[in-house]
Amino acid sequence: MVADRKLSEAELFQVVGAGWKQHESEKRKKTFQEKLKGKPVFSMFLLFLIVLGCVFANVVANHDPSGFYLQNLNTPPGKEFIFGTDSLGRDIYSLIWYGGRVSLVIGLLGTAIITVIGVTYGCISGTAGPKVDSVLMRFTEMCGSIPTLLLILILSAVLQADDVISISVIIGITGWFALARIVRSEVRQIRNSDYVMYARLCGGSFGYVMYHHLIPNFVSAIMFVVISSISSCITMESTLSFLGLGLPADVISWGSMLSLANKALIMNTWWVIVIPGVFLVITLMCITSMGSFVRSEVNNHYSNL
């Protein structure tokens, strides 16, 4: 039939205009390689391998991470100890996977706390009146002006944080200020929308409006900050442990492994510093790469509206 015939180039130009070539390419089903184009595939693959190794650390590790092999102190990388041993005789290869598990848990838990506090606080400030909004934002700016590391050090000393949960909570409650400002800005743009006003008029509670109408409309805008918070939490834990103010020595993390750096420099045992540092840097770079990809996708989405 005539309706089923294929349009010529001239007829297609009349239908969709000068962009007929783009229209024709969009109609064609994309191949697997085209779907992966522009995506941080290598970063996602590396991060997947690291996370997989940390999750199944008991399978990947070939030595007891808490074992002290006193006959092999500061042994360089070799057949028995793939990544060598530290000054306490512990197998670095096994410590990497068990320590990565702790660091990733702190990163995810701290990010969850940052997200919950930042989103809730930003929604309250964005929907509140001018006076309440001004007070809430001044408080955020005041807290944000204090160096984050200083706040964490003060809270760690006061609360005597020395376990994974408490360290994650402290990092979380001191890192939500930037996210709250972004959420507040997004909420103020949509708070007078018809669907939000209708939900309020129908008696919808603040929690209902926030969960069903506010968050779905700005979640894409905060994904970069949320993903970047994972690397920030891991970095902060490593910094605290490196300074001797984080997790105790018996709790293995990448940061606590790097806390032996001063001894390693004196004794010229480079593998004690380099190997945990490489895993930490690769993980942070992969997370940052994924966050940058999400931000570029969001920017492209808004620029095409």
Which residues does each predicted region cover?
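Hydrophobic alpha-helical transmembrane segments of membrane transport/permease proteins
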Residues: D4-S8, G53-S87, L243-I252
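Periplasmic/extracellular loop-to-transmembrane helix junction in inner-membrane transport proteins
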Residues: K27-K35, H63-T111, S259-G277
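C-terminal transmembrane helix and the adjacent membrane-cytosol boundary/short C-terminal tail
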Residues: D163, T174, I227-S228, T269-L305
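Transmembrane alpha-helical segments of polytopic membrane transport and secretion proteins
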Residues: M1-F45, S289-L305
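Amphipathic cytosolic juxtamembrane alpha-helices at the membrane-cytosol interface
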Residues: R90-V105, L109, G129-M137, R191-N192, ...
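Glycine-rich helix-loop "coupling/hinge" segments at transmembrane-helix boundaries
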Residues: A157-L159, V187, M236-I275, F279
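Generic hydrophobic transmembrane alpha-helix motif, especially the helices
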Residues: I82, D86, I92, G126-R181, ...
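Transmembrane-helix boundary motif in ABC transporter permease subunits
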Residues: A57-V60, I106-E141, L153
